[in-house]
Structures are given as structure tokens and as C-alpha cells.
């Protein structure tokens, strides 16, 4: 039996949810000690492919999220309620890409934990904060889109942007509170591998020997950062689907074209948020399942043939990929963001795209024409009031 197959369970922490930055993962120790033997063991080609993939995730993710943030702060028309949440998502993704992903990449070549006790606690805190910001922001976004679809013509309050910023800040605070126990209890533990008579250090949230703690930790992570938020999102989108189905029987007439476009705009944004939620669910599911499997099959997991190396790497890469896909999903779904993204990517000054009709405030509409007697241009300003005196909301739903 190869060394890879006979390693102790102390070296089997492979979950990003629990051990994104831990050095006791199978891949890191086996790479360092050249313990990968057998027909299906990765060689130098596999390591090169892994590092190229990690470098691609980091580079593409930083570029995409940085452009998204820049577009938001430089373009006044993009500073809307849903875009505030999406920009907060981008900050969380950048945090993960700049810290936890590079640290995880060191596991494949480095011997032991390289970043000390303080680094262990700080990186554990950052990792869980970033995951919390992602899933909790998507949950709040779904609630916001439900409200927008149910009441599509409701007037935006004057302090809507300020309240949304406060909500985004609250999400960060809640995520930090959930991540605080991880930082407090994470520590660097020293282990000995009897098969190779060597010791190594690992950053973990609990002692490896505590099986019950591992099971509780994996279940809590799965529930708090996956099942519960996605269940809430599913409820909101079920209500959105029901509302949209009913609204097809009561669509505004052509004479109310502004109302029609406003409703269609909000439907489109609801679909955009749903795509972001689906990407999160897809990217993080394998990692959560693998961590649960590891936690509840502690003894049998010592035989690593149960989980092929490619599946371990796939789950890690897929989870990290979620931090770089959102800007490109927006590029695909939003023509407005696509124009700004192209301009920033080409280092050109972004031209302001013309807002759709649904984003033009109709309470202050300028009309230009010619006075027949003089032939000169004449500008008159008229006030248009629709929907019981409520004016349209400017740019609220632009993405």
C-alpha cells in the first residue's frame, strides 16, 4: 500500500469550509513528501495545472471584481440599491482572493503551516467572514427583489441608498460575529505521522482528535452558510414566481409604457440575482458535501482511495471560483454593465450609456421643439405626474 493510502486521519483535512488555510490537507503533505505513488497519483504536470488554475482564479477574480467596484464608484447612475449589495459582494470576493486562495496554494509544496498562530486565527476569521458576506448578501438581495417585484411601482424613499448602505454594513458585522468563534478557537496544532516518522503543524478550528467537534462544526457550517440561507432564498423566489405569474394577467397597457418597462426591469434584475444565487449554490455544494463526508467517516477516511485526488481539487477550485464569476455573470446579463466593463477593460474613459426609459424621472421632463412663427428653438419644461402623483424612481433598478 502506498504512503498516500496509509496516512493517518490527522492529514485528511481537505475542506475549504473548515480548512481553507490548513496545512494538514492530503494534497500538501503528500506533495511535500513525495507520497503520491501509484498509477493515479499526480505528478509535476498535475501540480503545474493546479498552480495555473489557482493563478487564473486569482488574476481573473481580482480583475473582474476591481472593475465592478470601480464602475460602481465612478458611475453615478450605477449607484443603485441592488448594485450596492453586488458591490459589497465584490469586496468580500476580493478579500478571499487576496488572502485565503494564495495561502491555500502553498499547501501543495510547503511543509507544515507557514503563517504562525496569529496568521491561523486571522485567516480563519477572514475566510469565514467572506463566505458569510456572500451568502447573507444574496439572501438580503433576494428579499429586496421580492419587495421590488411585489410592489413594482412603489416610490423609492429619499434615504433608500443610505439605508441600503447600512444594511450592507450590517451584513459585514453579522458575518464577522459568526466568524469570531472560528478565530478564537483556531490554533496551530503539532501532529506526528507514524508512517514517516515526521511531525508537521496544522491550523485547525479544533483538535483533530475531537471527532464530535468536527461533526458539529461541519453541520453548523453546512446549515448556517448554505442550507438555511438558500432555503430562505428559495421561499422568496417561489413568492416572486407566483407574483410574476399572477401579474401576467394584469400587465399595464401600452399607454402606460413607463410602468410596463419598470416592471420588466425589475423582473430582469430578479433573474440576475437568481443566477448569482445559483452560481453560489453550485460552486459551494461539492465542498460542503466533501467536508460532511470526511467528518462523519473519520476512521474509514484514512484510506484516501475513497475520495480521488481529482475530486478533492475540484471541490476546492470550484468553491474558490465563485469569487471570480459574479462580475462575468453581470457582464453576460446586463448590457449597461457590459458597456462600462468594456470601457474600463480597454482603459478607455467610460461613456455614460443612455438609461432605459424606466430610469428617466418623469416628473421633470424637458421637451424641445420649434416655434412655428419664428422657426427658433424653443425649450419648455413640463411636469408629468403618473400613478397618483408618484414620480418614477431614478436608476433604482439599474444593474
UniProtKB/Swiss-Prot annotation:
Membrane topology, as annotated: Multi-pass membrane protein
Disulfide bond positions: 120-203
PROSITE patterns for the chain: G_PROTEIN_RECEP_F1_1 (PS00237), G_PROTEIN_RECEP_F1_2 (PS50262)
A Gene Ontology cellular-component term: plasma membrane
Membrane side Cytoplasmic: residue ranges: 64-82, 144-163, 242-272, 334-399
Highest taxon, organism lineage: Eukaryota
Residues spanning the membrane: 42-63, 83-103, 122-143, 164-184, 221-241, 273-293, 314-333
Alphabetical UniProt keywords: Cell membrane, Disulfide bond, G-protein coupled receptor, Glycoprotein, Lipoprotein, Membrane, Palmitate, Receptor, Transducer, Transmembrane, Transmembrane helix
Glycosylation sites: 10, 18, 29
Lipid-attached positions, S-palmitoyl cysteine: 347
Gene3D superfamilies assigned to the protein according to its UniProt record, in alphabetical order: Rhodopsin 7-helix transmembrane proteins (1.20.1070.10)
Positions in the Extracellular compartment: 1-41, 104-121, 185-220, 294-313
One protein family per Pfam: 7tm_1
UniProt subcellular location: Cell membrane
InterPro entries from the UniProt entry: Bombesin_rcpt_3, Bombsn_rcpt-like, GPCR_Rhodpsn, GPCR_Rhodpsn_7TM
MF GO annotations: bombesin receptor activity
Function as written in the Swiss-Prot or TrEMBL entry: Role in sperm cell division, maturation, or function. This receptor mediates its action by association with G proteins that activate a phosphatidylinositol-calcium second messenger system.
PANTHER family: BOMBESIN RECEPTOR SUBTYPE-3, LEUCOKININ RECEPTOR-RELATED
Oligomeric form and interacting partners: Interacts with C6orf89.
Family: Belongs to the G-protein coupled receptor 1 family.
Listed name of the protein: Bombesin receptor subtype-3
Amino acid at each position: 500500500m502506498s504512503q498516500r493510502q496509509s496516512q493517518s486521519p490527522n492529514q485528511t483535512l481537505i475542506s475549504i469550509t473548515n480548512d481553507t488555510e490548513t496545512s494538514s490537507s492530503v494534497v500538501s503533505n503528500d506533495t511535500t513528501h513525495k507520497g503520491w505513488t501509484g498509477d493515479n497519483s499526480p505528478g509535476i504536470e498535475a501540480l503545474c495545472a493546479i498552480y495555473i488554475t489557482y493563478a487564473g482564479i486569482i488574476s481573473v477574480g481580482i480583475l473582474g471584481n476591481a472593475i465592478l467596484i470601480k464602475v460602481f464608484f465612478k458611475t453615478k447612475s450605477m449607484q443603485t440599491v441592488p448594485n450596492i449589495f453586488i458591490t459589497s459582494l465584490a469586496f468580500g470576493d476580493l478579500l478571499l482572493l487576496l488572502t485565503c486562495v494564495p495561502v491555500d496554494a502553498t499547501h501543495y509544496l510547503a511543509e507544515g503551516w507557514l503563517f504562525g498562530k496569529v496568521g491561523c486565527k486571522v485567516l480563519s476569521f477572514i475566510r469565514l467572514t467572506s463566505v458569510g458576506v456572500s451568502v447573507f448578501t444574496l439572501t438580503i438581495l433576494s428579499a429586496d427583489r421580492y419587495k421590488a417585484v411585489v410592489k413594482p411601482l412603489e416610490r423609492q424613499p429619499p434615504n433608500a441608498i443610505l439605508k441600503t448602505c447600512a444594511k450592507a454594513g450590517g451584513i459585514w458585522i453579522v458575518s464577522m460575529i459568526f466568524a469570531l468563534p472560528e478565530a478564537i478557537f483556531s490554533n496551530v496544532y503539532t501532529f506526528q505521522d507514524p508512517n514517516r516518522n515526521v511531525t508537521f503543524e496544522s491550523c485547525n478550528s479544533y483538535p483533530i482528535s475531537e471527532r464530535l467537534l468536527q461533526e458539529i462544526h461541519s453541520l453548523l457550517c453546512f446549515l448556517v452558510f448554505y442550507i438555511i440561507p438558500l432555503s430562505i432564498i428559495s421561499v422568496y423566489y417561489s413568492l416572486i414566481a407566483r407574483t410574476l405569474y399572477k401579474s401576467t394577467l394584469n400587465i399595464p397597457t401600452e399607454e402606460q409604457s413607463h410602468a410596463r418597462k419598470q416592471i420588466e426591469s425589475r423582473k430582469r434584475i430578479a433573474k440576475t440575482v437568481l443566477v448569482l444565487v445559483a452560481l453560489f449554490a453550485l460552486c459551494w455544494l461539492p465542498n460542503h458535501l466533501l467536508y460532511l463526508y470526511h467528518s462523519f467517516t473519520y476512521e474509514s477516511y484514512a484510506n484516501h482511495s475513497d475520495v480521488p485526488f481529482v475530486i478533492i481539487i475540484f471541490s476546492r477550485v470550484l468553491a474558490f471560483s465563485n469569487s471570480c464569476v459574479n462580475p462575468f455573470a453581470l457582464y453576460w446579463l446586463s448590457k449597461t454593465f457590459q458597456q462600462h466593463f468594456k470601457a474600463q477593460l480597454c482603459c478607455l474613459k467610460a461613456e455614460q450609456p443612455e438609461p432605459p426609459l424606466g430610469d428617466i424621472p418623469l416628473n421633470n421632463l424637458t421637451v424641445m421643439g420649434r416655434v412655428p412663427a419664428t422657426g427658433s428653438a424653443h425649450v419648455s419644461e413640463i411636469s408629468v405626474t403618473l400613478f397618483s402623483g408618484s414620480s418614477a424612481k431614478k436608476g433604482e433598478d439599474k444593474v
